[in-house]
Amino acid sequence: MMFLSFNMISGGNTLQRFDPVACVSSVPLLLAPTTRPTFHFPSPFLSKPKPTYLFTSFSSSSSSSSSFFSSTTPPRSTMLHHDPLVSDVYATAISGVVALSFLRLFQETAKRDLFDQKLNRKLVHISIGLIFMLCXPLFSTETWASFFAALIPGINIFRMLVIGLGILKDEATVKSMSRFGDYRELLKGPLYYAATITLAAIIYWRTSPISIAAICNLCAGDGMADIVGRRLGGEKIPYNKNKSFAGSIAMATAGFLTSIGYMWYFSSFGFIEGSWKLVLGFLLVSIVTAFVESLPISTELDDNLTVPLTSILVGSIIL
C-alpha cells in the first residue's frame, strides 16, 4: 500500500510517495499509532462485593426468605462519644435513667392498685431485664464496657440486700416486687433476678447467645408462664399440680420468640452472627427450660434461680 506524505524541503512543501515496506533502516515520518489509549472505567460486572446475610447458612442464590433479615455489619467502637470511656459513662447514665424510670412507673401502678399485685410484679419481671438488653448497643466495644453495663443491675443487687435485710425501708419497691408484701422476699427471687442479669452482662455480655437465652427465658418466658398460667391454666401438669400446660407452653413460646428477636437485634449491630442453627438452639433451650420450670424442684428452689441456670447450662452445650 502506498502512502502520501509531506516533507519540508528548503522551506517549501513537496509531495512525495512513501513506501513503509521499503523503509526499514529509518523511522518513517508519518506512522499511524499502533496502540490506542485505553480508558479504565469501573464496571459492576467485573467485581461485585459479596453480600453478608444475617443467616449465613443461606447463600445469595438461596431462598429469598433470608433477605427479610438485615445484614450483619461490624459494630461501631463508640456510639455516644469519640472517647470510649466517656461514651460508656454516658451509656451507663442513660441506661440507669431508663431502668429507673420503668421501676418508678411500676411502683406507681402498684401504689395506685392499677393492676393486681401479682400481675404488677410480673410486669416488672418481664420488662426490666429486656429493657436493659435494649440499652446494650449504647456501650462501646472496649473490654470494660460490660462492667459499666453491669453497674445497672448490680446496683439493684445492693438495693435488694439493704431492703430485704430491713436496713432500708421502701414500701413501693416491696409492693411492686414481692408476692405477699414481705420485704424479706426480696432476698430470694428479686435478688436472684438482679444477680442473673449482672453476671450475664459481665461473663457473656452482648456477644454471646447464652446471655440472650438466659435473660429472655428468665424475663419473658418465666413472666408469661405465670400470667398465662393463672388465666388459662385449668389443666394442670400431672407431676406438678402447681403448674399448668398453658403456662409451660406460654413460657417456651415467649422465651423462644424473645430470644429470636434479640438475636436479630444484636445481629443488626454486628455483635453476634445469627443463623438458622442458632434459631433451633434457642428453641431447644426454651423447651428444656420450660420443662425444668414445671418440675416440683423448681418451685421448691426459685424460678429466678433454676430458669437462668438451666438456660446457661443447656445453652453452653448447644448454642
Swiss-Prot record:
Q: Which Gene Ontology terms cover its molecular function?
A: kinase activity; phytol kinase activity
Q: Looking at the keywords, is RNA-binding present?
A: no
Q: Where in the cell is it found?
A: Plastid, Chloroplast membrane
InterPro entries reported for this sequence: Phytol/farnesol_kinase
A single GO CC term for this protein reads:
chloroplast membrane
Reaction catalysed by this enzyme: phytol + CTP = phytyl phosphate + CDP + H(+)
**Entry keyword annotation includes Transferase:** yes
**Membrane topology field:** Multi-pass membrane protein
**Associated pathway:** Cofactor biosynthesis; tocopherol biosynthesis
The family assignment reads: Belongs to the polyprenol kinase family.
Function as written in the Swiss-Prot or TrEMBL entry: Involved in the activation and reutilization of phytol from chlorophyll degradation in plant metabolism, including tocopherol biosynthesis. Catalyzes the conversion of phytol to phytol monophosphate (PMP).
Q: What is this protein called?
A: Probable phytol kinase 3, chloroplastic
Q: Which organism is it from?
A: Glycine max
Lineage here is: Eukaryota, Viridiplantae, Streptophyta, Embryophyta, Tracheophyta
